[in-house]
Amino acid sequence: MAIQVVTTEQSTLFTIRTKHTTYQMKADEYGVLLHLWYGASVEGDMSYLLDYPDVGFSGNLYEAENRRTYSLNTLPLEYATEGVGDFRIPAIAATHADGSNALDLRYQSYNILKGKYAIAGLPAVYADEDEAETLEIVLKDTATDLQVTLRYGVLPELDMLTRCVSIQNLGTTPITLTKAASFCLDLPYGKWEWMHFHGRHAMERITERTPLIHGIQESSSTRGTSSHHQNPTAILCTPDCTETNGSCFGAAFLYSGSFQTKIEYDQMRQARMVMGLHPDLFRWELQPNATFDTPEVLFTYSDSGLETLSHRFQKTIREHVCRGKYQKIERPVLINNWEATYFDFNEEKILKIAEEAARLGVDMLVLDDGWFGKRDDDCSGLGDWFVNEQKLKGGLGTLVQKVKALGMRFGIWFEPEMISEDSDLYRTHPDWAIQIPGRNPMRSRYQLLLDLSNPDVQDYLYKCISDILNSADISYVKWDMNRSISDWYTALLPANRQGELPHRYVLGVYALLERLTSAFPEVLFEGCSGGGGRFDAGMLYYCPQIWCSDDTDAYERTIIQYGTSFFYPVSAVGSHVSVVPNHQTGRVTPIETRAVTAMAGSFGYELDLNLLSDEEKEAVTQQIQQFKEYGSLIHNGTYYRLSNPLEDAYALWAFVSEDKKEVLVQGMIFRTEANMVRHCVSLRGLDAKAVYRTKDGAAYTGDTLMHAGVLLPKSWGDYYPVSMHFVSE
């Protein structure tokens, strides 16, 4: 069994084992649940690591009497509270009926279950019953009837753990939750560095690594979504940690709304990481006999560097978070009309793009923003999900039939969560928009938010979208979300419960997505929020791929996709070849380089193919053929980062098949210099004894490629593409 429990008169010891890790905690003689160990596999009781120093201004547990060395302020706690002597970051906070806010959680019982728990209404890692176990540890406040159940999901073969928390009010008066984190991890004395992934619109998930300093560091979003600006993931690592060496802990929040990751480096040089819902946008009235479930955190530990950490997250998210028909299969090569036409199109213009795309081998045409309502710019029409027949004279069905006659499938864009003030929907239901009575709402992109916590809004959107999907043979939906959320208010809740809206909004989005993906299992849903503004594991539970960024510049995409790869699989990355000069940067890169970068994702085109030269069109045909040849390797192979594009003169990555018989190395050399020395790069993950051959007949042993490396091609011009394919005999 992956979970072992040893009970004595004085304590209960919990040990969770995966293939290469051990996680251990103990309910001690006072019922305090202490964290003992998370790291490489070890045997025995790790309680000997507990230190009980006598530290001034660190108060002592009442039951400890004269034992001045027992302090919640210095001990490693499994789920930290506030108001009872631990002055570090709490994981949970609540206000009781009498106005007090102390919580003193003590151990009550445990339960071990076969299989992996699920969370009603929320995304969660899933597994077959024989692939996982669940540990539940029940804690209870000493003075009230608040009960907390810590849930641990264990996937031993994947070396992955999950955590979530259920909070139940067993009393007779409401309790107000003001913080309910999903994850709390205390790490022992030592030097630690923090990796997080910051950014902005059109430049998401830039890797940043800094030493922990005394005090509190934070990455978070209060935008109602996980945001472009910080990603709901974090890594703590030792200073010597590299891709292949050193210790590191990683955590990913399966949630698409506002979040907070806080890390405190305390007076004892211990680190505490707390991850969960952002408390600034959370206040939940927990009624008697009601239960609140937090979202889930997925986490792991590696003692062999960041590469192993990433491989575990990528595999788990690809195979145990993403769902449905498109979970593992290669995605269709698509052409999106957005950067080719923006709002200015009609059926003739769209068909002209489709005809050329079909001739070159593209699988699917996606019609982006502007096909519905009164939508000639971004000032109107959102919410009116009916076809604009001034643009599409024969309606959507006629266009889809014509596209299908070309041998292509058809996809369509929606922005369901938004409403324009200049729309029939707003004129009929202004009360459905999120806005505060008596205040002018903040507009963003000239649009407001629909209140997705409202079941009537969910039903309206479900009917609109399902009517469109049923009206024609549609194979793909791009689900966009183009603003941050402000002006939080809903008429559905009383004043003292308005703090529930941000979380209820996300639950509403999930409920609508669950209904639609269940009703249309053959449709590929792609998430989007102005690119990568909601690129998180929670959204991947419903949409197996997400548009990675609105920045389609090939050079900058290497940086964005590099940061994305630390947690997310390549199969989840929406990535296209776009026009040059690039619409975001003005940069000109070769079409071969743009294709290589886009192949490290779903692959497609976002331009007017009719405007390409004959030479470029021939390149497109070859690129599509190449992607279809390598698609399974790219989406299901093991991904290796072979450079850091923020530091190196090139971006390089590799895909290695599970049986290690096939390797694809791709990337770009950023700059070319006269008499330039060629770069030599070592590969990883190969069969050391196998002989690998390229298409031109060159042969190398695996250990040669991994130790001596391979020379990159001689570059000619900046942003020079690299693509090398090796197959073992």
What are these regions (language model features)?
Residues V5-T7, S11-K19, Y23, L33-E264, ...:
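Polysaccharide-binding surfaces and accessory modules of carbohydrate-active proteins
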Residues H20, E243, N644-D687:
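Carbohydrate-binding surface patches
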Residues H20, V165, N289, I335, ...:
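Conserved, mostly hydrophobic/aromatic
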Residues S71-K116, E243-S258, Y301-K325, V362-L367, ...:
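Glycine-rich, aromatic-flanked loop segments that form ligand/cofactor-binding clefts
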Residues A102-Y107, W284-D303, Y720-V727:
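Short Pro-Gly-centered flexible turn/kink motifs
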Residues Y326-K463, Y476:
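Aromatic-lined carbohydrate-binding/catalytic grooves of carbohydrate-active enzymes
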Residues K393-G395, R427-H429, A433-P590, S602, ...:
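Active-site neighborhood of glycoside hydrolase catalytic domains
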Residues R671-E729:
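C-terminal beta-sandwich/jelly-roll accessory domains of carbohydrate-active enzymes
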